[in-house]
Amino acid sequence: MTKVTIVGAGKYGSTTALRVAESDLASEVVMTDIIEGLPQGLALDINQSRYVEKYETKVIGTNDYSQTEGSEVVVITAGLPRKPGMSRMDLLSVNAAIVEEVTREIVKYSSNPKIIVVTNLSLIHISE
């Protein structure tokens, strides 16, 4: 089966991890984030519902990209929200840097994964 990585454990990332797990589209979902402890706690919550909701997919929370090794699909939900006074170009620059860094880290551990970017549409070309 497929290994799926979700980068970003915020609202979009954690919901994506839950939905992929519930649908049994993958044998393993790895959720990673820069906030220490966040993806681990969310993974525990999702895993606790496995037996009640009757799905087999295991969810792993981590802050270490090496645990994403062998991912066939990567969903990038990481990014910062627009802050008051921030222009769209400033937001683009910040989030483009995040997507570039995430992509560099992912390809260190997974060869030729399918990458899905869930963020501002203007960032899609960054991950190519």
Q: Predicted regions span which residues?
A:
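Conserved N-terminal Rossmann-fold NAD(P) cofactor-binding segment
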Residues: T32-S71
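Glycine-rich Rossmann-fold phosphate-binding loop(s) that bind the pyrophosphate
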Residues: A9-G10
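Conserved NAD(P)H cofactor-binding loop of Rossmann-fold oxidoreductase domains
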Residues: A78-L80
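Extreme N-terminal starter segment of soluble prokaryotic enzymes
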Residues: M1-V4
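N-terminal Rossmann-fold NAD(P) dinucleotide-binding loop
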Residues: G13-S14
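Glycine/threonine-rich flexible loop motifs
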Residues: K83-N95
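Residue-level detector of conserved catalytic or cofactor/ligand-binding positions
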Residues: S122-E128
